[in-house]
Amino acid sequence: MQEQEISFIFKYNEGLCMNIDSDSILMSILDMSLHQQMGSDRDLQSSTSSVSLPSVKKAPKQRRISIGSLFRRKKDSKRKSRELNGGVDGIASIESIHSEMCADKNSIFSTNTSSDNGLTSISKQIGDFIECPLCLLRHSKDRFPDIMTCHHRSCVDCLRQYLRIEISESRVNISCPECTERFNPHDIRLILSDDVLMEKYEEFMLRRWLVADPDCRWCPAPDCGYAVIAFGCASCPKLTCGREGCGTEFCYHCKQIWHPNQTCDAARQERAQSLRLRTIRSSSISYSQESGAAADDIKPCPRCAAYIIKMNDGSCNHMTCAVCGCEFCWLCMKEISDLHYLSPSGCTFWGKKPWSRKKKILWQLGTLVGAPVGIALIAGIAIPAMIIGIPVYVGRKIHNRYEGKDVSKHKRNLAIAGGVTLSVIVSPVVAAVTVGIGVPIMLAYVYGVVPISLCRSGGCGVSAGNGKGVRIEFDDENDINVGGTNAAIDTTSVAEARHNPSIGEGSVGGLTGSLSASGSHMDRIGTIRDNLSETASTMALAGASITGSLSGSAMVNCFNRLEVQADVQKERCSLSGESGTVSLGTVSDNASTKAMAGSILNSYIPLDREGNSMEVQVDIESKPFKFRHNSGSSSVDDSGATRGHTGGASSGLPEGKSSATKWSKEATGGKKSKSGKLRKKGNMKINETREDMDAQLLEQQSTNSSEFEAPSLSDSMPSVADSHSSHFSEFSCSDLESMRTSCSHGSSDCHARFTAVNTLPEVENDRLENSPHQCSSALLSKAASCSDVPQPSHAADEHGTSRSGGKPMVDLCFGDALRETNNNHSHQTADLKVAVQTEI
């Protein structure tokens, strides 16, 4: 019976636990207490008390018959009543336990329902929060403003920060962060709640709209955002700002300050020059590679002129202006289309600089030559590909269409076969039409559009050569130093040189002499140098006349163009200068010294020509305005003849020093030189008078060693024609009649009017180390040939009076020879005063 009780209790507890699964832990505790209580009841009650247990369940009473009950005797009534009373007590105790357990069950159910209500309330509260797609935080629904144009939602803090960034960077076409729909201005105002930002937003919107208007002109005055919409003002371009207190007058065409009696191009060049000059002075006259690179990082928009910053790292060059939406190329700064980088314009989609002119020309020539081959290859591949590919494509499409449908196999195969057969018939026609139309279009593009567009934009480099025919320029415009990035520029004389920007129209006075022209410098500024013997005269011209003038052209090389051409013509000795007057002022002592040294150095270069002479032409394109120095100078007119006397000293020169100018020969295009006969005579007389000249040199040295100082140069250089025609006459020795020299050894006051400037020691050492014997022999031969025909000459001094001398004139080469042969003497030899004989 005890086993039955335990089994019943476990069954009861098991049923209770099945009803209360959520509180299994609590029910296990109740089971333990129930087992303890039932154990105590069994100890107190009889063994028959457990018979009444089925009555608790209200089940029908059942009798069990066993073998023991048949042989056992019946119980008396007293004992039976006592047993019944004990059974009633057991039933009452079990009912009390059941009631307690039911009460505990109800309490547990009540706690479960309360917890479920709490969870549902919490879940309802969690359901009211939305995650922001920008900051990934959960906010309440009231933190997500509604947008008129799209259904996307973001928190108000993220949207406000997003709008602030967009407006501060002038991006007024603000779209949704998650799609391309633009915000409504009303939504922007509600989200921002900032009057200052909204005012800036409206200003940017208005400016964006006005920029699109072709007749809108903005006032160029600083801190004036007034715009004038001028219709039909092209004929009367003077506009006036209508803002109160401004009244600035500006031009309709160039959109800059009004420039009366001046074209827009001239005014633009003048503004650019003044801007560069201010930049040079403000930056302590220093142009470095970093400053040039920084200037390349900031460029204005070609439509609205809004400045845009881009790192010059070779990234994408297809730019879009944030203010006006203009699409332009960062390299050429022009509005472009999608085909800009596919055409041979020189601009690349990635890169730091466009193609050079040489590369563009080579690409153009390669395209013109290789276009037929390429087009033939494309047509040869396209025709069989279309004939074979079209039927295959049609068959696959029909098969995929009928696949998966309830169509008979025979019907599907019939449709595929019919489609393929039809495509086989049609594909040759399609291929022929495509090739027949595409090939002429490609040929027309290659041979028509590309060359015309390149030549129209100046990219092909073909131009007229000033009556010399068509010329193809292969010099690279990109190699010209912009901003001082490639050239070695001395920073001590840039500002002074800016006052003399034009070589062709003005003078080169006031130059400081710290800049010189070498072969590498001439290559950098685009000088055309010949590989033959014309190089000597080109270098002589560069050394003598262009020395010191690169300080002006190096800073404005974007607008100035220097071309030196050397042409050889038969039986003509002339020097034509189309560049007007070239003069060197009194400030440039060093420049004059270097120029003269360059002329002396280049004079020893032999030329193997018989009866040929050089014509050097200098073409200089510069600005239309000019400055002239006050110092006296020698000049060359357009016809190549000199118009003034040389040797005029400046008023600010110190007295007491002597100098001599170089002798020269006048060369005109209308006279023919008798170089053959005279040269033979001169060569015959050289050998006869060599010993006499040695004696004269020794006598001249002893006479002048204690009287004169070192050979010197005048402060005002001779003209280009005077100096270089002397070189050509020295080379050929053709026209002896035109060489007229004089010698004046008078009083010392004659020499006191000139300033002595020592020549460069580098030139002397170079001559002595390399070829001392050849130089001395050449000088002696020149002296013999020149002094063999003594003629009275006239010298023009600084007062305009002429002086004559009976002694033969000793050239500057005699002074050089004296210096070379007498290096060990304590005093240097002096150079005689040499005047320039000119005809007016």
Swiss-Prot record:
GO cellular component, as recorded: centrosome; cytoplasm; glutamatergic synapse; hippocampal mossy fiber to CA3 synapse; membrane; postsynapse
Region entry Interaction with CASR, spans: 660-840
Swiss-Prot/TrEMBL keywords: Cytoplasm, Cytoskeleton, Membrane, Metal-binding, Phosphoprotein, Repeat, Transferase, Transmembrane, Transmembrane helix, Ubl conjugation pathway, Zinc, Zinc-finger
Extent of Basic residues compositional bias: 671-683
UniProt binding sites for Zn(2+) 4: 251, 254, 259, 264
EC number: 2.3.2.31
Full protein name: E3 ubiquitin-protein ligase RNF19A
Lineage, top ranks: Eukaryota, Metazoa, Chordata, Craniata, Vertebrata
